[in-house]
Amino acid sequence: MSDIQIAQANEATEMKSITAIAEQIGLQATDIEQYGPYKAKLNFQAINRLKEKEDGKLVLVTSINPTPAGEGKSTVTVGLGDALRQLDQSAVIALREPSLGPVMGMKGGATGGGYAQVVPMADINLHFTGDMHALTATVNTLAALIDNHLQQGNVLNIDPRRIIWKRALDINDRALRQVVIGLGGPVQGMPRQDGFDITVASELMAILCLATDITDLKNRISKIVIGYNYDREPVTVGDLEVTGAIAMLLKDALKPNMVQTLEHTPALVHGGPFANIAHGCNSILATQTALKLGDIAITEAGFGADLGAEKFLDIKVPQLGKTPDTIVIVATIRALKYNGGVALADLTTENLDALKAGFSNLAKHIANMQRYGVPVVVSVNEFTSDTAAEVQLLQDLCQAMKVTAVPTSVWANGGQGGIELAKAVLAALQQPKAFKPLYDPQADIKSKLTTVVTEIYGGRDVVFEGKAINQLKQIEKNGWAHLPVCIAKTQYSLSDDPKALGAPSDFTIHVRELIPKLGAGFIVAMTGAVLTMPGLPKKPAALNMDVTADGQISGLF
């Protein structure tokens, strides 16, 4: 059966009411705002009350660089939570919510897979509780207010050529990357060049995921740089005097969403910035709440450990105020063979030499996570084509790095297939940790970028090209150089070349643009050819989707 068929078969008979799920973790009906029988948001009264409780342990799930062969990071995250509860551990999962763009594009659903899913699967993947739509409307409201300011006299002297705030849609639409607006004469607005980002790449998504309450949300929104005036001085949302209106539109989206897994493990699914073009972590409020509601909180970071995990550890952790107690790296034998040079069509054939060669990618991610001083466990997400010899070789290679590699079959077997992984994680949680940040935020921008490139990616250096050269000077002039860096980079390689698999070295990262995100609290460095508005593939996942006369969805994944 497909993922959606498995989800639908179980949803019809097995789902508990969301109030029952809330009761499992000590919440009352008055603590949640229901969106039907199986979805809810936690209200701020409950969140504030929970602040008095001690934090549980934090487990971060990440992976090797993604490949067409698939890794199953979200699936393992869900399955690990289910497995821990089977071992009588109080576990709560904290995930990102899916973006409609990838759902309809290349990826399909984003709620785990097989018998390790969060449900209601179709609802979560499509419109869920409306957070993405609220964000999209808010991004575009701000854009409209900026253009209205230009039209109504431009008191702030904003230079239309230097507006950096873009509109947004939660879909993949390459035709909207560059647009011209305001055509048609004086009453139609000020003509200027504009563009669209996908909603999850917008700074407002990052802010939603980093804000700790409405006051913090408003403070961050007020700092957003929307562009520059004719004297090349920054203009902020606060200068426009619309902070309150923008925050108002996000007041409900700020509340974490609660659902359940197929095995009734509570799951907080909230926020969804991409890790290749944003910081790639779910909301701080969801993670903090999971830490209060369970003895163990399991969360994930997007794409490979070079992107999502690095940003989790260097951007989110300082603001979360909690470091991971264990890091799980998800890998598959198929993906490692792909990194070792095997073609997609041949990945089901045993190939120990290719596995050993492709292990270089996993080895680099293991070393990187160990660099932060946190215990590491490897989850080997099983496929039927894996051979005993391949599994043994991978375990031996990991053991040589003093890391336990555990075969995991949660897609096929749910929590039961993650019991050994859960035991390994529980053992790792008992190990000492000595968290070490990667860099000093007070260092200059180039030093911080160079540290990430040399220490995490394995490269040689960083060069600034095109607009980035003057933007670096502007950032330094405006006193923003103390902010952490968020590198926008291809997810498919440790380098900025998506075709450089394994563990490339001695390469240069090319920074073409530096974008200050003062509300989020970091500087985005655009590298390579990465885009903030994706396009659809030749055969988008949407081609396989349908809905029956009675509302039954098919083909979602």
From Swiss-Prot:
It catalyses: (6S)-5,6,7,8-tetrahydrofolate + formate + ATP = (6R)-10-formyltetrahydrofolate + ADP + phosphate. Disulfide bonds: none annotated. Gene3D superfamilies: Domain 2, N(10)-formyltetrahydrofolate synthetase, Formyltetrahydrofolate synthetase, domain 3, P-loop containing nucleotide triphosphate hydrolases. One of its GO terms (molecular function) is ATP binding. NCBIfam families: PRK13505.1. It is an enzyme of class 6 (ligase). InterPro entries: Formate_THF_ligase, Formate_THF_ligase_CS, P-loop_NTPase. This is Formate--tetrahydrofolate ligase. Pfam families: FTHFS. ATP binds at residues 67-74. The lineage of its organism: Bacteria, Bacillati, Bacillota, Bacilli, Lactobacillales. Its EC number is 6.3.4.3. One of its GO terms (biological process) is tetrahydrofolate interconversion. Keywords: ATP-binding, Ligase, Nucleotide-binding, One-carbon metabolism. Belongs to the formate--tetrahydrofolate ligase family. It comes from the Bacteria. Pathway: One-carbon metabolism; tetrahydrofolate interconversion. The gene is fhs. It comes from Latilactobacillus sakei subsp. sakei (strain 23K).
